């Protein structure tokens, strides 16, 4: 005799997650807002985003539309966004937003490294060589000595700036 509505003990339990209608609406509104932010970006920037072709076309259309047509197109973009994975799109958008602050942080890091090269000498240069093996050790040592002399004599920091330019060029090559 067959059992009805019973699972065998070896079958895994399926957990059903109930989502309220309000929560679904909030999620859809978030996707639509993400779509609005994408519409505000330049086409050259959008090329770097992981978007489907339909979504790319909808965004391009929304950028051309005005007022009511734009509002309807944004709703369509929100609908298309439901079929996309929003996490990589959000990550790419965050990267675009924080591009300036990331560049500033990288420059501060290079400035601190330059200060260490001038103050600590060979020990800091060894650290630079670990980070950037293609760096010219001899030139860095020479510039570090010159920068220390310039600082002591109160002269303009020509070598100090040149060390920074070398580190900046090495950092850009690595990227």
UniProtKB/Swiss-Prot annotation:
One of its GO terms (cellular component) is cytosol. The keyword Ribosomal protein does not apply. It comes from the Bacteria. Its main location: cytoplasm. Pfam families: DarP (PF04751). One of its GO terms (molecular function) is rRNA binding. Keywords: Cytoplasm, Ribosome biogenesis, RNA-binding, rRNA-binding. It is found in: Cytoplasm. GO terms for biological process: assembly of large subunit precursor of preribosome. Belongs to the DarP family. PANTHER family: UPF0307 PROTEIN YJGA (PTHR38101:SF1). Member of a network of 50S ribosomal subunit biogenesis factors which assembles along the 30S-50S interface, preventing incorrect 23S rRNA structures from forming. Promotes peptidyl transferase center (PTC) maturation. This is Dual-action ribosomal maturation protein DarP. It comes from Vibrio parahaemolyticus serotype O3:K6 (strain RIMD 2210633). The lineage of its organism: Bacteria, Pseudomonadati, Pseudomonadota, Gammaproteobacteria, Vibrionales.
